Amino acid sequence: DHRDLHSFPTRRSSDLAAARGLCGHDSGIACIMGTGSNSCYYDGKSIVTNVSPLGFILGDEGSGACLGKLLVGDILKNQMTPELKEKFLKQFDLTPADIIDRVYRKPFPNRFLASLSPFLAQNLGEPCVRALVLNSFKAFLKRNVMQYEDYQHQKVHFIGSVAFYYKEVLAEAAKEMGIQLGAIIKSPMEGLIKYHN
């Protein structure tokens, strides 16, 4: 499974748990943004519709795996400053050959790529890094959230480590795209406790 849903037995129940934890008894758009990304429209009782996340190769915009993939692509194609490239390779003790091996020949490349994304959080002050994260979040909003009917009148809530640790950039992306940002929480338990009380 390519999503950050270790606390959940199945995708369907995890989406419902996330929606309930985020929206409570109100309608809204619930988004999961961790190793993978996902979203659904929730009517206050159940999930009405879901835009397929498509996994980290074709979709999963804004996820840790997608951010890691974009980061590695920019590092290997010299789109980051030489200083950032050197800092990245040194911090993770990697060579370009190691990266290719981990992505194309080893199992779970999505997890490997997601494990690199904290480098972006540590270097958000760099304009090229901030732009990479911002553009990935805007792509998530455009390709997922904006597909839901009446999205302009719904609060859009987020759960997951990526949404939580990059909440400032996520808020900037939402503002630029004209999206009403709701709650941003790290773990589903916070919201579920509130939902069931």
Where are these regions (language model features)?
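Conserved acidic
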Residues: D1, S63, C128-L132
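Short, small-residue-biased leader/transition segments that mark boundaries at the very start
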Residues: D1-H2, H6-S13
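Phosphate-binding/catalytic loop of phosphoryl-transfer enzymes
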Residues: R11-E83
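ATP-binding/phosphotransfer module of carbohydrate and carboxylate kinases, centering on a glycine-rich
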Residues: G21-I29, L70-N197
